[in-house]
UniProtKB/Swiss-Prot annotation:
Name of the protein this chain belongs to: Histone H3.2
Entry-annotated residues carrying Phosphothreonine: 12
UniProt subcellular location: Nucleus; Chromosome
Assembly and binders: The nucleosome is a histone octamer containing two molecules each of H2A, H2B, H3 and H4 assembled in one H3-H4 heterotetramer and two H2A-H2B heterodimers. The octamer wraps approximately 147 bp of DNA.
Keywords: Acetylation, Chromosome, DNA-binding, Methylation, Nucleosome core, Nucleus, Phosphoprotein
Residue numbers spanned by region Disordered: 1-43
Residues bearing the modification N6-acetyllysine: 10, 15, 19, 24
Superkingdom, taxonomy of origin: Eukaryota
Biological function: Core component of nucleosome. Nucleosomes wrap and compact DNA into chromatin, limiting DNA accessibility to the cellular machineries which require DNA as a template. Histones thereby play a central role in transcription regulation, DNA repair, DNA replication and chromosomal stability. DNA accessibility is regulated via a complex set of post-translational modifications of histones, also called histone code, and nucleosome remodeling.
Family the entry assigns: Belongs to the histone H3 family.
Post-translational modification: Acetylation is generally linked to gene activation. Can be acetylated to form H3K9ac, H3K14ac, H3K18ac and H3K23ac. H3K9ac could compete with H3K9me and prevent gene silencing. H3K9ac is restricted to euchromatin. Methylated to form mainly H3K4me, H3K9me, H3K18me, H3K23me, H3K27me and H3K36me. H3K4me1/2/3, H3K9me3, H3K27me3 and H3K36me1/2/3 are typical marks for euchromatin, whereas heterochromatic chromocenters are enriched in H3K9me1/2 and H3K27me1/2. H2BK143ub1 is probably prerequisite for H3K4me.
Molecular function GO labels: DNA binding; protein heterodimerization activity; structural constituent of chromatin
Chain positions found as N6-methylated lysine: 5, 10, 19, 24, 28, 37
Amino acid sequence: MARTKQTARKSTGGKAPRKQLATKAARKSAPATGGVKKPHRFRPGTVALREIRRYQKSTELLIRKLPFQRLVREIAQDFKTDLRFQSSAVAALQEAAEAYLVGLFEDTNLCAIHAKRVTIMPKDIQLARRIRGERA
């Protein structure tokens, strides 16, 4: 590994760490009471980044099939009663809906980044849809 030049830094003037003799020794020798292990927690954002990578790699549908099918049938009821759907038609609708949502969230994220934020907000979705020409 290449050696890098170290630059001098100003000391912050913090206190030197004190030695803890009695308390640490007592803590180490004492048996663990209860024995309940604290559940492991990742730092905020770690799991979110892992999920982003996982879902960007995958191609499977993210909305469950039956709830989506019920939604399609419920919306179709407003136009005509007793409509029947081929399973491939519902699958095509679901593919299109998920592709639309993914694209909308990508544009929404760009709007949030443009506003120097990392959190998306409803106003970002509204701006993305307005720029796309979907809503005046």
